[in-house]
């Protein structure tokens, strides 16, 4: 009976170790994907701000110097 218990524990242990490793790799993959998404959103924000500053600069040049102070 003790032999069966030891065998069962061994089988369960050997099954849980790969499961744990797979979960860890899955979490790492999700973290990498989140970082890529964050980097892409930062790039988009940078492009939008550059575009906005360029457009306002062009409109200022076309409008005769921009807004006039009152």
UniProtKB/Swiss-Prot annotation:
Family of the protein in this entry: Belongs to the frog skin active peptide (FSAP) family. Plasticin subfamily.
UniProt entry keywords in alphabetical sequence: Cleavage on pair of basic residues, Secreted, Signal
Pfam families hit by this protein: FSAP_sig_propep (PF03032)
GO cellular component: extracellular region
Function: The native peptide is a cationic amphipathic alpha-helical antimicrobial peptide with potent activity against both Gram-positive and Gram-negative bacteria. It has weak activity against fungi and shows low hemolytic activity.
Propeptide: 23-45
Tissue specificity of this protein: Expressed by the skin glands.
Main location: secreted
This protein's domain notes: Plasticins have huge conformational plasticity. They can display random coil, alpha-helical, beta-sheet or beta-harpin structures.
Signal peptide: 1-22
Subcellular location(s) of the protein: Secreted
Disulfide-bonded cysteines: none
Keyword Secreted: yes
Region feature (Disordered): 25-45
InterPro entries referenced in this protein's UniProt entry, alphabetically: Frog_antimicrobial_propeptide, FSAP
Name this protein carries in UniProt: Plasticin-S1
